[in-house]
């Protein structure tokens, strides 16, 4: 439907029998009204044409082939000069065959049928409206018992029949025959009510606003009573108050949406368009039919039987009619929701029939599969793995995914650079994976962001923009800091990749959706890009160091001369001297050559402003040299001073892990400063 703002929208709810009839009924150009499905047949076994008034009738649902009627005559669609607009022999209109995707039919039920969703689903809407137990309503719907109608105080057939049960045995066989004569159902319906018709009558008699007033008054009265001191009674009162609140909310919803309660009981059963429940011919001439067709046939068979019992048979026992009404109710229940009342209906191969509920609900249902989430072009999907070397705003795309997503852009680049004469040649180069293809792909990806999405998308951080780069393998590489926004981890999670095509979408991705633009939670303002457990453990290992202390290895200013260019092992690690390094590169190079450990203490020459060294810490030791220079040794650094007490060099006691962390922080600060400037 289209609202007042011209927005397309879908609304699900109850509709009146008049609305169902308006959807399904159509008037042919000759004035004939069609739309009711009366026969349980699909296709004729000889001609393979739809049966008239059947589940695939062309008069009701439209022609199978555009502009061709059931007789085989052809008319041009949309030609105003063509007359008539339908075939006078078969009654099929000359219209587009796509009408069979939305043209509905209906089945006129011989008795009212309760919609099983409103009766059996929890909470039961019908039970809430009538304020009766669900088991009692089920017994009434499925004709297990009846209730007497309020009538005047006069002799009734119910009383008469009760008296006959105690009379002489000679009347035993004649009295039931009297109660099953033609026309007795009129007297029976005057005094008793059963089946879905009884539910419909009670729902039709309800005044919704009166229900709200009485429910609110009762809820207020229960609230004023207070606690009784009995735990069981208090729980009972609490459950009653919750029920009254749910009842008032339900009634308000019906009033707001202009839905009548009696619409929860069906008199007309809609028939889906045939293209939504097709019969397909496969190899070998075999036919495959949708399960819904079999369930519709079951409903029509039982409904026609009940119609015959009510109209043609003269001596039909009342119990037989009630039993047939129950069968019609069960057939409609199976069509709407197979298995909701217990054992589901199965076919000859012991396979459960898929009902209407099974078609639309679940992950593979109509809504989540094709309406809410559908497959789109320029998208891909793969497993995510950690990419610790990536920047926060970058992601790694596998070559297979990248070349498929950006194939049209690569083709345009090949043609513009005169590397391919046409699209076919460009596609051949891509299939053969020539080196120039990857070069152009990298150029295209540099200026084109991509969107990463992880289901379920519960908030706006569930889909963010990244700058893609090519990586080896078949998994998407992701920076670990952005995982919290996606609620993702690296234990097999999958993410979807989308390419924004329009300039507006690309601008929105760059300005609003880039990962480095979403560092704070939009809900509470807390940081969303925080280190994960893996990163915290890595930082701890990186900065833990060896805590032997400076006194464990007595200082010797010439220990750096004893540093050997050889690997170390655990046997001589404890007795090894602490080496001296002049810069970062020497220390990291020694670690990569496995001459020192990640947490090995070392002395590193530090270019530091002398004004920063203003600590009042007393040196642990002071060593003097023959030339007058001396070394002041502190807990984590040492200072070499001249004779005039001027600082010559400063060495800090650190580890390779601390050095690596410091360099990363320094590069990040420098990059941020350059970006801001």
From Swiss-Prot:
Gene Ontology terms describing biological process: DNA-templated transcription
Required co-factors: Mg(2+); Zn(2+)
Gene name, Swiss-Prot/TrEMBL: rpoC1
Organism: Spinacia oleracea (Spinach)
GO CC entries: chloroplast; DNA-directed RNA polymerase complex; mitochondrion
Residues reported in the UniProt entry to bind Mg(2+): 489, 491, 493
Keywords linked to the UniProt accession: Chloroplast, DNA-directed RNA polymerase, Magnesium, Metal-binding, Nucleotidyltransferase, Plastid, Transcription, Transferase, Zinc
Protein name: DNA-directed RNA polymerase subunit beta'
Note on cofactor: Binds 1 Mg(2+) ion per subunit. Binds 1 Zn(2+) ion per subunit.
Entry's EC annotation: 2.7.7.6
Main localisation: plastid
Keyword Cytoplasm in annotation: no
Function as written in the Swiss-Prot or TrEMBL entry: DNA-dependent RNA polymerase catalyzes the transcription of DNA into RNA using the four ribonucleoside triphosphates as substrates.
Catalytic activity, reaction form: RNA(n) + a ribonucleoside 5'-triphosphate = RNA(n+1) + diphosphate
Keyword set includes Transcription: yes
Lineage: Eukaryota, Viridiplantae, Streptophyta, Embryophyta, Tracheophyta
GO terms of molecular function: DNA binding; DNA-directed RNA polymerase activity; magnesium ion binding; zinc ion binding
Chain sites annotated for binding Zn(2+): 69, 71, 87, 90
Localization: Plastid, Chloroplast
Family to which this protein belongs: Belongs to the RNA polymerase beta' chain family. RpoC1 subfamily.
HAMAP family: RNApol_bact_RpoC1
InterPro entries, alphabetized: DNA-dir_RpoC_beta_prime, RNA_pol_asu, RNA_pol_N, RNA_pol_Rpb1_1, RNA_pol_Rpb1_3_sf, RNA_pol_Rpb1_clamp_domain, RNApol_RpoC1
Subunit structure: In plastids the minimal PEP RNA polymerase catalytic core is composed of four subunits: alpha, beta, beta', and beta''. When a (nuclear-encoded) sigma factor is associated with the core the holoenzyme is formed, which can initiate transcription.
């Amino acid at each position: 439907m289209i609202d007042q703002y011209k927005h397309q929208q879908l609304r699900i709810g109850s509709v009146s029998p008049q609305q169902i009839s308006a959807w399904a009924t159509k008037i042919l150009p000759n004035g004939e009204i069609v739309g009711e499905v009366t026969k349980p047949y699909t296709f004729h076994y000889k001609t393979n044409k739809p049966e008239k008034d059947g589940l695939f009738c062309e008069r009701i649902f439209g022609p199978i082939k555009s502009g061709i009627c059931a007789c085989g005559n052809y008319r041009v669609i949309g030609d105003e000069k063509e007359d008539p607009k339908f075939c006078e022999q078969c009654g099929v209109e000359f219209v587009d065959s796509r009408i069979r995707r939305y043209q509905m039919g209906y089945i006129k039920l011989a008795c009212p049928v309760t919609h099983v969703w409103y009766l059996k689903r929890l909470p039961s809407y019908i039970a809430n409206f009538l304020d009766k137990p669900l088991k009692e309503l089920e017994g009434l719907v499925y004709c297990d018992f009846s209730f007497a109608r309020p009538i005047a105080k006069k002799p009734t057939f119910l009383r008469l029949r009760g008296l006959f049960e105690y009379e002489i045995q000679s009347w035993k066989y004649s009295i039931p025959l009297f109660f099953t004569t033609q026309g007795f159902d009129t007297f029976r319906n005057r005094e008793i009510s059963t089946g879905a018709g009884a539910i419909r009558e009670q729902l039709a008699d309800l005044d919704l606003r009166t229900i709200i007033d009485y429910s609110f008054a009762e809820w207020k009265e229960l609230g004023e009573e207070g606690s009784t001191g009995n735990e069981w009674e208090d729980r009972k009162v609490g459950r009653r108050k919750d029920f009254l609140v749910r009842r008032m909310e339900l009634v308000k919803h019906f009033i707001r949406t202009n839905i009548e309660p009696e619409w929860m009981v069906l008199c007309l059963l809609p028939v889906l368009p045939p293209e939504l429940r097709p019969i397909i011919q496969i190899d070998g001439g075999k036919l495959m039919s949708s399960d819904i067709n079999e369930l519709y046939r079951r409903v029509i068979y039982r409904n026609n039987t009940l119609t015959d019992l009510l109209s043609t048979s003269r001596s039909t026992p009342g119990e037989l009619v009630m039993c047939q009404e129950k069968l019609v109710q069960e057939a409609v229940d199976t069509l709407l929701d197979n298995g909701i009342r217990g054992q589901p209906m199965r076919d000859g191969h012991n396979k459960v029939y898929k009902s209407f509920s099974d078609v639309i609900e679940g992950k593979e249902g109509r809504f989540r599969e094709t309406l809410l989430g559908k497959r789109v072009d320029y998208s891909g999907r793969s497993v995510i793995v950690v990419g610790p070397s990536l920047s926060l705003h970058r992601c790694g795309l596998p070559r297979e995914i990248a070349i498929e997503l950006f194939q049209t852009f690569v083709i345009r680049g090949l043609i513009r650079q005169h590397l391919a004469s046409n699209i076919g040649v460009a596609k051949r180069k891509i299939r053969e994976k020539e080196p120039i293809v990857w070069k152009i792909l990298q150029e295209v990806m540099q200026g084109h962001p991509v969107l990463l999405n992880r289901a379920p998308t519960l908030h706006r951080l569930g889909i963010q923009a990244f700058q893609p780069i090519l990586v080896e393998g078949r998994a998407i590489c992701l920076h670990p800091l952005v995982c919290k926004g996606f609620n993702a981890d690296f234990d097999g999670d999958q993410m979807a990749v989308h390419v924004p095509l329009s300039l507006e979408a690309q601008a929105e991705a760059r300005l609003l959706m880039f990962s480095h633009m979403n560092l704070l939670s939009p809900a509470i303002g807390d940081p969303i890009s925080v280190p994960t457990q893996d990163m915290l453990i890595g930082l701890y290992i990186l900065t833990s160091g060896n805590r032997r202390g400076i006194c464990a290895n007595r200082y010797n200013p010439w220990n750096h001369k004893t540093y050997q260019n050889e690997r170390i092992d655990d046997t001589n690690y404890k007795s090894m001297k602490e080496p001296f390094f002049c810069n970062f590169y020497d220390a990291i190079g020694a670690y990569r050559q496995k001459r020192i450990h990640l947490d090995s203490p070392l002395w590193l020459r530090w270019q530091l402003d002398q004004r920063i060294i203003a600590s009042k810490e007393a040196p642990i030791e002071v060593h003097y040299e023959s030339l007058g220079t001396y070394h002041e040794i502190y807990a984590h650094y040492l200072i070499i001073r001249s004779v005039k007490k001027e600082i010559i060099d400063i060495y800090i006691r650190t580890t390779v892990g601390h050095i690596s962390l410091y360099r990363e922080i320094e590069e990040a600060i420098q990059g941020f400063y350059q970006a801001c400037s």
